[in-house]
Structure formats: C-alpha cells, structure tokens
Amino acid sequence: MEKIKLRLYQLTLFLSFISLMLALVNSGKQREFFYIAIYIAILGLAFEYKKITLKPFSIALPILLIGLLNFVWYMVYEYHSEGLNMYSDYLGASKKLLLASILVFYIDRFKDYIDRENFKKYFLLATATGFALATGYGLWQASQGMARVEMAINRATVSAYVYSVLSLAFVYSLYLQQNVKLYVLAGFTILVSFFVILLTGTRAAMGLYLLLAIVMTLYHFRRIHLKSTLIFLCIVAGIVVVSYKPLISPKIMQTQTELENYEKGNDRTSLGARFSMWTIGIQNGLAHPLGQSVEERETWTKKYIQNGHPHLATALVYIKVHLHNEFIEKYSLQGIPGLAILLFFFMSMIGYAIRNKNALLMTAMLLLLLYGLTDVILLSSEALIFFMILFALSTPFSQTKQR
C-alpha cells in the first residue's frame, strides 16, 4: 500500500512538471496534463484519507476560497440568465481554482514522499526544458517577422507574464544548485529573458522583470558579490542601449502620447481605456457593494456614461470582458466580499512565502500582484493553470515541518 501511495505522488509530480514545461508551447496539452495530475491527486488523497489534516496552514486554502467565491457569484448572478455556460470565464476559472486547490494541498501535505535534493534536480530539469522551449519558440516567431512575440498563447501580454515567471523559476532552480558556473548561467538566462520580453512588447513585464529578478536574488542570497553585480548591470545596460531605439523607445513614446491624449479627454488608447475602465469599475463597486452580474454592470455603466460622463465611453468596449485590474474587476462584480477574499489571497500567500523563506513563491506572487494592477490574470485559462501548477510545485521549497 505504501508503495502505491508513493507512486501516486510521484506520478502527480511528473504530470505537473510536464504541464509546467508545456505552458508556452502547447496550451491544449498543458491543460490536459494539469487535469490528469489533479485526478491522480484526488486518487492519492483517497488513499491518504487517514493522514489528511488541516494544520499547518496550506496555500490551498486561499486558492479554494477564490474558486468558491467565483462559483457562488456565478450561481447567484449568472446562472438564472444563461444556465451552466461552460464557456463563461468565471465558471471556468472557478472550476480550475477549486481543482487546483486539491492539487496544491496534495503536493504540499505529502511532500515528505520525495527527497528535497532530488526534487531540486527535477524542478531544474522541468523549468530548464520549459524555458528553452519557450525561448526558442519566441525567437523563432520574431525571426518570422511577428510584431509581438506570443508563443503558444494568442495574447502577447499573457505570454509575457507567464514567460517572465517561468524564467525566474528557472533562475531560482539554478540558484539552488549552489554552483558558480550555474550562477553565471542564471545571469545569462535573465539577460536572454529580458530580450525576449522586449520582443513581446508588454510594458508591465518590461518594467518589472529585472526588478523582480533582483528582488528574488537578494532575498535568496541575502548578500551579493559587488563585482559580479557590476558586470551584470553593465551587460543589462548594453542590452538596453542596443534595444532602446527599436523596442524600448516606441513604448515610452506611446505611453507619453497616451497620457497626453487622456488629459485632453481622449480615452481611446490602451492606457486611456484602462483609466476609464478603472473609474467605471470603482463606481460600479460603490453602487453594488454586494455584487452584480456582468449584464447589470454593462447596463449600469451605459447609464452612468450617459448621465454626465461621456469621457469614459471607451470603457464600454471592454465592459463585457474585464476591466484590466484584478482588484477593480472583483470589486465591480463581486463587491466587498470579492475584494476582501482577493486581498486575503494575496496577503496570505505572500505572508506564507516570507514566513517559510520561499523565494520562488514570493516572487511569483509579487509578479501576479503587480501584473494584476493593469490586467486580469486569474481569468486567463493558460496563465491560471500555469500559476496554479507553479504554486503547487513551490510548496516543497517551503521550510515547514509537517505534523
């Protein structure tokens, strides 16, 4: 029996690693391995039912709460008008989150089944493979003349978010090997990754990737060799100089132009539309503190714009999709309960990562939080699956003792 339990856990890890590797090269297969891993985890938990405990705290809890929130909101506000619409973003996200919480709980609770040093090697292999495949795919797309690299995800922004976190996961796995040559490879990985992110044309990732790479490095090592740091910064500066005119400067000029247009009352730009959506979202939340349906949000927004706020009209273009801010999106549809649970999700996950000295989880959560200020990641199927798999695989790195 013990051998069966061990094999089930190992199979769950194996399937999770494959899903992680395929995140940016085959979204369909990524999703399939994600679900198969969960089904094996459920079977594993059935065998382990006598050992299941709720203490110590598991990051599966905040994930479960977000999933339950989405499902309850859907049943209260959307079910009456459309029934069980399997194509609903919120219903789909709730299903993935609820199932992912099982996977995270299983991998976290029974991580004693795998040797920590062996797990480091497997994680290195998985992230290295995933990073190499994604980078090669992205560079190939760029060589074919694609304006914004998007890899296997048909949205360049989401690809940039996932790629940046995958890259830092690989860098973290290199740090764990405690080898000087691999530290050099980690530096090279960061440089290559930054260049690929520039090719996606995603401003948030371009601005945050290097910053979070530095934060993760400082948090992991607690001290940095000055000479190595200076060499690395010089190389980064060189990449910035070479890439400035073709890749960076156009984005800076675009940002300046969009800000100027918004100040003149024109919100028909990327940033301008976001400002309008955020304003509309906050007003929706204030008017509906306990939540509302997507249809009700659209109807209320139309009336609000007609009644003295025509400068926010571009928000109507995106109101049926999302409002490009994780917190405002939650507040506008799920009211104060949705906002409170989302805050708990981020605070508890980041707090857990800090308490348990888990640099990987902390970095991933910080990027998810910061990216969520200008986009909605937890509704994207590919990104959601990637982050849930990474959260599950990050738990063996936590310095906790099982009871």
Predicted features and spans:
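A juxtamembrane structural motif centered on a specific transmembrane helix
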Residues: 1-11, 176-184, 355-358, 376, ...
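Loop-to-helix entry and N-terminal half of a specific, functionally important transmembrane alpha helix
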Residues: 12-18, 321, 325, 351-374
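Aromatic-anchored transmembrane helix interface
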Residues: 36-38, 59-73, 83-109, 122, ...
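Alpha-helical transmembrane segments of multi-pass inner-membrane proteins
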Residues: 102-105, 115-146, 154-221, 243
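Transmembrane alpha-helices of multi-pass inner-membrane enzymes
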Residues: 168, 364-373, 377-403
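A membrane-periplasm/extracellular boundary helix in multi-pass inner-membrane enzymes
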Residues: 220-264, 279-286
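Hydrophobic transmembrane alpha-helices and their immediate junctions
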Residues: 227-228, 332-366
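Long extracytoplasmic/lumenal interhelical loops at the membrane interface
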Residues: 268-272, 276-279, 286-334
